[in-house]
């Protein structure tokens, strides 16, 4: 599952769980982007976003977090993400889960022509968001029917944008994201106007504990 995860919230986790159940996936790998090339806003430090994702997914043995995008130099392109994941899992069939709104702009993605050769795409959307195949016309209209699946996830009514705004306004984040992520956001003073404390996170390692 690719995304900025700035911050990760229950919508992401429910979407991952639902898609895993729908397609019978053995595991879901969350891949926080390193340097998102399409974002027109400031994005939190990659290590903060990575650690929040680790915290959020730690209790689910089917979930894991990859650093392939964070550790790769330069802007994050989905093509490179999928190639790296293929190299790490050469015998696995890949399903790339991303927001349906991102799929709407797929023709502007770097190397989009090769993306559907690398993975089956699953676009997850919030309730009421309409994305028809006609929105991604042209060559993509010739894709096999099983190349792209759109799934509506009610929990995606929660958004990272709203979570950031609530944090900036000192409003509660409880029940929008896992408790550990709420505490991390508070401790690191993320999304606040004033700079946060000088806390080094580059070498931080979290113990996720043993899974049942």
UniProtKB/Swiss-Prot annotation:
Catalyzes the reversible adenylation of nicotinate mononucleotide (NaMN) to nicotinic acid adenine dinucleotide (NaAD). Its EC number is 2.7.7.18. Keywords: ATP-binding, NAD, Nucleotide-binding, Nucleotidyltransferase, Pyridine nucleotide biosynthesis, Transferase. Pathway: Cofactor biosynthesis; NAD(+) biosynthesis; deamido-NAD(+) from nicotinate D-ribonucleotide: step 1/1. NCBIfam families: cyt_tran_rel (TIGR00125), nicotinate (nicotinamide) nucleotide adenylyltransferase (TIGR00482), PRK00071.1-3 (NF000840). It is an enzyme of class 2 (transferase). It comes from Mycolicibacterium paratuberculosis (strain ATCC BAA-968 / K-10) (Mycobacterium paratuberculosis). It catalyses: nicotinate beta-D-ribonucleotide + ATP + H(+) = deamido-NAD(+) + diphosphate. CDD domains: NMNAT (cd02165). HAMAP family: NaMN_adenylyltr. GO terms for biological process: NAD biosynthetic process. This is Probable nicotinate-nucleotide adenylyltransferase. SUPFAM superfamilies: Nucleotidylyl transferase (SSF52374). InterPro entries: Cyt_trans-like, NadD/NMNAT, Rossmann-like_a/b/a_fold. GO terms for molecular function: ATP binding; nicotinate-nucleotide adenylyltransferase activity. The gene is nadD.
């Amino acid at each position: 599952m690719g995304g900025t995860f700035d911050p990760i919230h229950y919508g992401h986790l429910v979407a991952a769980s639902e898609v895993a159940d729908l397609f019978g996936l053995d595991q879901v790998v969350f891949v926080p982007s390193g340097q998102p090339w399409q974002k027109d806003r400031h994005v939190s430090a990659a290590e903060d976003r990575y650690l929040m994702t680790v915290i959020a997914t730690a209790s689910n043995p089917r979930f894991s977090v990859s650093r392939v995008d964070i550790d790769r130099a330069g802007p994050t392109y989905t093509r490179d993400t999928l190639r790296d994941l293929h190299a790490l899992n050469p015998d696995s069939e890949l399903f790339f889960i991303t927001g349906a709104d991102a799929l709407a702009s797929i023709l502007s993605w770097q190397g989009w022509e090769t993306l559907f050769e690398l993975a089956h795409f699953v676009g997850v959307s919030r309730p009421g968001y309409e994305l028809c195949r006609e929105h991604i016309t042209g060559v993509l209209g010739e894709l096999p029917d099983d190349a792209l699946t759109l799934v509506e996830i009610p929990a995606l009514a929660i958004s990272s944008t709203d979570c950031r705004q609530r944090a900036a306004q000192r409003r509660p984040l409880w029940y929008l994201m896992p408790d550990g992520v709420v505490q991390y956001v508070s401790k690191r003073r993320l999304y606040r106007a004033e700079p946060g404390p000088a806390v080094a996170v580059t070498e931080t390692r979290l113990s996720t504990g043993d899974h049942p």
